[in-house]
From Swiss-Prot:
Keyword Transmembrane: yes
Membrane topology: Multi-pass membrane protein
Protein name as catalogued: Non-structural protein 4
Localization (cell): Host membrane
C-alpha cells in the first residue's frame, strides 16, 4: 500500500482561514509596534525614555512571535493521509492528523518495539525481499589498455572472444586476469 500525503486547509469549507487571517493581523500589529519603536528612537527624548520604549516594544514583538509560533505550528500543519492500492485507486480511509501528534505516536510505537526482539532490517524495510547475487562466483577481468576500462567476463564470454578474434595470438592491448 502506498500512502499519499496532501496538505489541507486547516479550516475546510471556509473561503478564508481564520488562523491565517489571525497571523496576518498579528504581523500587521508587529509591524506597527516596530514603526512606533523607530519613531521614538528618532524623536528628541532622553536616553532613559528611549530605552524604556525600546524594551517594551521588544517584549511585545517577542510575545507576538510566540503567539505566531503557537498558532502556526499547531493549526497550519494539518495533512491528509490516503492509502493507494496496487492499481493506484484511493481507498476510503481518509485521516486528517496533526504532524506533531503523529510523530509522538511513532516515538511511542518505537519504544514499544525496542522492548521486543525485532529484526532491525525487517522493521525498517518490511517490503524488501532477499535477493541472490547475480554475479558469477568465478569471473575474469578484461582490461583494455587503450580505453583504460575493465570488464567483468565469464569463462563462456572469454571463450567467445578468443574464437571470434581475427588473430587470437596478437592481442597485446587486452589483459585477462582471473579472480576467485
Amino acid at each position: 500500500m502506498t500512502i499519499q500525503v496532501q496538505n489541507l486547509n486547516c479550516c475546510p469549507g471556509r473561503f478564508v482561514c481564520v488562523h491565517k487571517m489571525t497571523l496576518l493581523i498579528i504581523l500587521i500589529i508587529s509591524a506597527a509596534v516596530t514603526v512606533i519603536d523607530q519613531l521614538y528612537q528618532k524623536l528628541p527624548y532622553d536616553e532613559q525614555t528611549k530605552y524604556i520604549v525600546s524594551t517594551i516594544t521588544d517584549g511585545i514583538n517577542a510575545t507576538i512571535i510566540s503567539v505566531m509560533a503557537i498558532l502556526g505550528l499547531n493549526n497550519l500543519n494539518r495533512v491528509r493521509y490516503s492509502k493507494l492500492d496496487e492499481n493506484g485507486v484511493y481507498s476510503q480511509e481518509m485521516v486528517t492528523m496533526n504532524v506533531q501528534s503523529d510523530a509522538a505516536n511513532n516515538k511511542k510505537q518505537l519504544k514499544k518495539k525496542e522492548n521486543e526482539d525485532v529484526d532491525e532490517e525487517k522493521g525498517l524495510y518490511p517490503n524488501l525481499k532477499l535477493t541472490e547475487p547475480t554475479a558469477p562466483m568465478i569471473h575474469n577481468y578484461m582490461y583494455d589498455h587503450k580505453t583504460q576500462q575493465a570488464y567483468l567476463l565469464t569463462e563462456h564470454q572469454i571463450e567467445q572472444i578468443k574464437q571470434n578474434s581475427v588473430d587470437p595470438n596478437n592481442t597485446p592491448k587486452i589483459e585477462v586476469r582471473s579472480q576467485f
